[in-house]
């Protein structure tokens, strides 16, 4: 199979590319991968260094909104796995234009190219944030989208465009929506790496409000395995939820990170809450479990310890990426 991975130099995209080319994902042996990435601040070619010399890998630097480039790159592929997105909620509140451009308009450009070249599958990677907050219970795939942040609204627009392309043009589209991710190579503005690297630098960790907002957490390797199952076996025109089932408040998460780093509560600093901060997200994952046999393999406690160890051992990777403003300001979107 020849797949085009957009945003493949980012956190989740690069994990998917590395695992695919190493043959550790189901049915990935022999896959040829092209990565298309603009290399914005959160994209990093070092994330792809472990597989950069493989013959079945190609990297193209470019913008998914560039119609001519996208049309040229898409040609000759069997499928697109579309990770490319602007993902920082706080940045979207301050300036939404780039989020709408990339997450909605960029998706449209890719869908048009996929239709022209008659690709066999388009997997659109999305987020639980498109549903907005849910006080109890869990959203299923039939729940209506009701995003609150501009980031989530732009992602929802991309989701709806992708599904509309299936219904209108017959393109084989599948949408995945996932809970928060964590693991190696995550940009240090995000909650877990921000907290972890702050503690390693002797700086306090900033917790929004009272710290009672709740999120579900999934290791990035489990997310990518689920995406591969959807790529190979998901039903066209469907949405699949991907989640880990480990739900924590931000304070509970901070406690586990501090424990893993050998630090105490004096390292916590409460900061003003984000405008329109969703209190809780939760996804029902029955569909992907029953149809595709997915279940997470990485226990959160084990994965968190391994993640903290990775940041401890890879300061040379994250230190150049981390600005003083990120260390002292508010945490970014938790796990995208």
From Swiss-Prot:
<dbReference type="InterPro" id="IPR036291">
    <property type="entry name" value="NAD(P)-bd_dom_sf"/>
</dbReference>
<feature type="binding site">
    <location>
        <begin position="206"/>
        <end position="208"/>
    </location>
    <ligand>
        <name>substrate</name>
    </ligand>
</feature>
<feature type="binding site">
    <location>
        <begin position="63"/>
        <end position="64"/>
    </location>
    <ligand>
        <name>NAD(+)</name>
    </ligand>
</feature>
<feature type="binding site">
    <location>
        <begin position="37"/>
        <end position="40"/>
    </location>
    <ligand>
        <name>NAD(+)</name>
    </ligand>
</feature>
<keyword id="KW-0456">Lyase</keyword>
<dbReference type="Pfam" id="PF16363">
    <property type="entry name" value="GDP_Man_Dehyd"/>
</dbReference>
<feature type="active site" description="Proton acceptor">
    <location>
        <position position="151"/>
    </location>
</feature>
<feature type="binding site">
    <location>
        <position position="180"/>
    </location>
    <ligand>
        <name>substrate</name>
    </ligand>
</feature>
<protein>
    <recommendedName>
        <fullName>dTDP-glucose 4,6-dehydratase</fullName>
        <ecNumber>4.2.1.46</ecNumber>
    </recommendedName>
</protein>
<feature type="binding site">
    <location>
        <position position="102"/>
    </location>
    <ligand>
        <name>NAD(+)</name>
    </ligand>
</feature>
<dbReference type="GO" id="GO:0008460">
    <property type="term" value="F:dTDP-glucose 4,6-dehydratase activity"/>
</dbReference>
<comment type="pathway">
    <text>Antibiotic biosynthesis; novobiocin biosynthesis.</text>
</comment>
<comment type="function">
    <text>dTDP-glucose 4,6-dehydratase involved in the generation of the deoxysugar in the novobiocin biosynthesis pathway, an aminocoumarin family antibiotic that targets bacterial DNA gyrases.</text>
</comment>
<feature type="binding site">
    <location>
        <position position="181"/>
    </location>
    <ligand>
        <name>NAD(+)</name>
    </ligand>
</feature>
<feature type="binding site">
    <location>
        <begin position="151"/>
        <end position="155"/>
    </location>
    <ligand>
        <name>NAD(+)</name>
    </ligand>
</feature>
<feature type="binding site">
    <location>
        <begin position="7"/>
        <end position="13"/>
    </location>
    <ligand>
        <name>NAD(+)</name>
    </ligand>
</feature>
<comment type="subunit">
    <text>Homodimer.</text>
</comment>
<dbReference type="GO" id="GO:0017000">
    <property type="term" value="P:antibiotic biosynthetic process"/>
</dbReference>
<feature type="binding site">
    <location>
        <begin position="274"/>
        <end position="277"/>
    </location>
    <ligand>
        <name>substrate</name>
    </ligand>
</feature>
<feature type="binding site">
    <location>
        <begin position="190"/>
        <end position="191"/>
    </location>
    <ligand>
        <name>substrate</name>
    </ligand>
</feature>
<dbReference type="GO" id="GO:0009225">
    <property type="term" value="P:nucleotide-sugar metabolic process"/>
</dbReference>
<dbReference type="InterPro" id="IPR016040">
    <property type="entry name" value="NAD(P)-bd_dom"/>
</dbReference>
<keyword id="KW-0520">NAD</keyword>
<feature type="binding site">
    <location>
        <begin position="127"/>
        <end position="129"/>
    </location>
    <ligand>
        <name>substrate</name>
    </ligand>
</feature>
<feature type="active site" description="Proton acceptor">
    <location>
        <position position="129"/>
    </location>
</feature>
<feature type="binding site">
    <location>
        <position position="250"/>
    </location>
    <ligand>
        <name>substrate</name>
    </ligand>
</feature>
<feature type="binding site">
    <location>
        <position position="87"/>
    </location>
    <ligand>
        <name>substrate</name>
    </ligand>
</feature>
<comment type="similarity">
    <text>Belongs to the NAD(P)-dependent epimerase/dehydratase family. dTDP-glucose dehydratase subfamily.</text>
</comment>
<keyword id="KW-0045">Antibiotic biosynthesis</keyword>
<dbReference type="InterPro" id="IPR005888">
    <property type="entry name" value="dTDP_Gluc_deHydtase"/>
</dbReference>
<feature type="active site" description="Proton donor">
    <location>
        <position position="128"/>
    </location>
</feature>
<feature type="binding site">
    <location>
        <position position="215"/>
    </location>
    <ligand>
        <name>substrate</name>
    </ligand>
</feature>
């Amino acid at each position: 199979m020849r797949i085009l991975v957009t945003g493949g130099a980012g956190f989740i995209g690069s994990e998917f590319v590395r695992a695919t080319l190493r043959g550790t994902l189901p049915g990935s042996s022999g896959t040829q991968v092209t990565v298309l990435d603009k290399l914005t601040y959160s994209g990093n070619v070092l994330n792809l260094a472990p597989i950069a010399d493989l013959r079945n890998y190609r990297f193209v630097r470019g913008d998914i909104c560039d119609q001519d480039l996208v049309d040229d790159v898409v040609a000759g592929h069997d499928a697109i796995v579309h990770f490319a997105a602007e993902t920082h909620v706080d940045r979207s509140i301050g300036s939404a234009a780039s989020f709408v451009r990339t997450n909605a308009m960029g998706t449209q450009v890719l869908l048009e190219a996929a239709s022209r070249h008659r690709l066999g599958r388009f997997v659109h990677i999305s987020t639980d944030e498109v549903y907005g907050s849910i006080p109890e219970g869990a959203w299923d795939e039939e729940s209506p989208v009701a995003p609150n942040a501009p980031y989530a609204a732009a992602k929802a627009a991309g989701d709806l465009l992708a599904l509309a392309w299936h219904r209108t043009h017959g393109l084989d589209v599948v949408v995945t929506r996932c809970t928060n991710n964590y693991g190696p190579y995550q940009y240090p503005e995000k909650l877990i790496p921000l907290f972890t690297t702050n503690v390693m630098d002797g700086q306090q960790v900033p917790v929004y409000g009272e710290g009672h907002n709740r999120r579900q957490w999934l290791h990035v390797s489990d997310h990518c395995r689920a995406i591969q199952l959807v790529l190979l076996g998901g039903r066209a025109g469907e949405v699949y939820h991907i989640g880990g089932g480990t739900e924590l408040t931000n304070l509970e998460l901070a406690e586990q990170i501090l424990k893993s780093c050998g630090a105490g509560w004096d390292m916590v600093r409460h900061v003003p809450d984000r405008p329109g901060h969703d209190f809780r997200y939760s996804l029902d994952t029955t569909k992907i479990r029953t149809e595709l046999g997915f279940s997470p393999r990485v226990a959160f406690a084990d994965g968190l310890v391994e993640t903290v160890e990775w940041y401890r051992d890879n300061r040379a990777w994250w230190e150049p990426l981390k600005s003083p403003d990120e260390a002292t300001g508010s945490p970014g979107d938790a796990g995208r």
